[in-house]
From Swiss-Prot:
Record flagged with keyword Transport: yes
UniProt KW Signal keyword: yes
GN (gene name): ptxB
Signal peptide (residue range): 1-23
Organism, scientific name: Stutzerimonas stutzeri
A GO CC term assigned to this protein in UniProt: ATP-binding cassette (ABC) transporter complex
Protein name, as recorded: Probable phosphite transport system-binding protein PtxB
Key words, A-Z: Signal, Transport
Length: 287
């Protein structure tokens, strides 16, 4: 009886999700754009004002920037049609795609490539000089749904040093990339993994003292953070959104993303993330 009730509840929630998505406006007057909650929310809103202005001008629509409390909240907001566009991390995109009908359409180009790296850092006083030294130590990650601050560094440690999180070292989820850098610099964690770009930005704006941390290594190149949109937006609006993003040439907008341009992407570009999840035994639909 309990199993039947659970099954009925699952079906009901799925139906509600589908109806909510269907009910979402195909051509909304105000476009709700969610930003990846990997840094301070007010800082993200302020820094992305040029993007908001650019989109309003070129899409001829009002734009509302949204920063959810965490990755899971953003995934659920997209699932229920409460946001129209979202700037995901690769892992959070794959998770969202497994739960909702969305389409990736653009990603940043940096140094001529639509790819990026994670960096693994250590506190200089931790006694950690290489990955193998992390055995028995405290490793800080960002959000569980983060690619560059969880999935990638965890995979690097597994593949290069045969270290399993929660088994060979303590793993602590501190929420954001910034928090990873701060916890490592302050000695609350021996090491941590985060986006190379965000690590460099944290040092540049004085969030951490660079002399308190050292770089242990970098990951390989992975597909950049994707912009995605609801599939049930009107075909005309979807085409316009794609064209506007790929055509962004405003220096201020690009500078805030530390990008040279935006390039078209497809769902298949993120199969490498799905493969990493399989290696770690992750079920994206239940995360």
């Amino acid at each position: 009886m309990k199993r039947l009730s659970a099954l009925l509840l699952t079906c009901l929630l799925s139906a509600v999700s589908s109806l909510s998505a269907l009910a979402a406006d195909a051509d909304p007057d105000v476009l709700k754009v969610a930003l990846l909650p990997d840094e301070n929310a007010s800082e993200l809103i302020k820094r992305n004002q040029p993007l908001k202005d650019y989109l309003e001008e070129h899409l001829d629509k009002k734009v509302q920037l949204i920063v959810t409390t965490d990755y899971s909240s953003m995934i659920e907001a997209m699932r229920f049609g409460r946001i129209d566009l979202a700037y995901f991390g690769p892992l959070s995109y794959v998770m969202a795609k497994s739960k909702s009908d969305i389409e990736p359409f653009a990603a940043m180009v940096i140094d001529g490539k639509p790819t990026y790296r994670s960096v693994i850092i250590a506190n200089v006083a931790s006694g950690v000089n290489e990955y193998a030294d992390l055995k028995g130590k405290r490793m800080a990650y960002g959000d569980r749904a983060s690619t560059s601050s969880h999935l990638i560094p965890k995979t690097v440690l597994l593949e290069t040093a045969d270290l399993t999180g929660g088994q060979d070292y303590e793993q602590h989820f501190v929420g954001t990339h910034d928090a990873v850098a701060v916890n490592v610099a302050n000695g609350n964690a021996d090491a941590g993994g985060l986006s190379e770009v965000i690590f460099n930005h944290a040092a540049e704006r004085g969030l951490i003292d660079p002399s308190k941390v050292k770089v242990l290594g970098y990951s390989g190149e992975y597909p950049q953070y994707p912009w995605a949109m609801r599939s049930n937006l009107s075909p005309e609006l979807k085409t316009k959104v794609r064209d506007v993003f790929v055509g962004i040439d405003d220096p201020e907008v690009l500078r805030n993303f530390k990008a040279e341009a935006f390039a078209p992407i497809t769902d298949a570009d993120y199969d490498v993330i799905r493969n990493m999840g399989s290696l770690l035994g992750l079920d994206f639909a239940t995360m």
